[in-house]
């Protein structure tokens, strides 16, 4: 199979269970099966919409793929690399290629850091250039994401509207030059008019940076607008 047609992400029989504990000794008495046997693939520059009601496990799927939550069982391969068995420097390098945009833009941003510091943190960790090069990079990303790179770079998250904060979140995800982004309810907390702006921005950025998205939402109309394919989750499956 050619590289262009080979899936970027392959998820097979993914399970993420959380133990139920009770008693004085916190004995495990059962399991909450948040994700119970999910399988799908995602191509390069493709968007897969993952839709389902609240509590169905769709957010857990996204975070399990990135290993923000450790899965119980299953297989996750990214560009042929076994994500679940990767550790140390290899995992760090892999995480540079896989990013996430969170639902709550305010809760996901450090209130004590300026936008400039938030956006430059990832490039510094991954040694993507000197201070001048990184600053130029994040100023370009701010401009590309609809933020003012001169006036906004030294502001704090509380000084922005919800839509602007989500733009910061998008720029942060792009700051390390990823290939795959989990959009975890990325527009759900925004007004309808702002939702359309953010979705159009994500589509433009996908074309420009050749990104693949796992777009998680509970609103089927939103998912259909941005997605190439749609998968539906119900009770972890």
PLM regions and their residue ranges:
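Hydrophobic anchor residue at the start of the ABC signature
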Residues: 170, 182, 198
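A short, proline-enriched helix->beta-strand linker immediately N-terminal to the Walker B motif
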Residues: 175-179
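P-loop NTP-binding/switch modules centered on Walker-like glycine-rich loops
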Residues: 53, 190, 194-237
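Conserved ABC ATPase signature
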Residues: 156-160, 164
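Conserved ABC transporter NBD signature motif
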Residues: 74-82
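Helix-to-loop junction immediately C-terminal to a conserved catalytic motif
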Residues: 66
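ABC ATPase NBD coupling module
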Residues: 25-29, 83-99, 125, 131
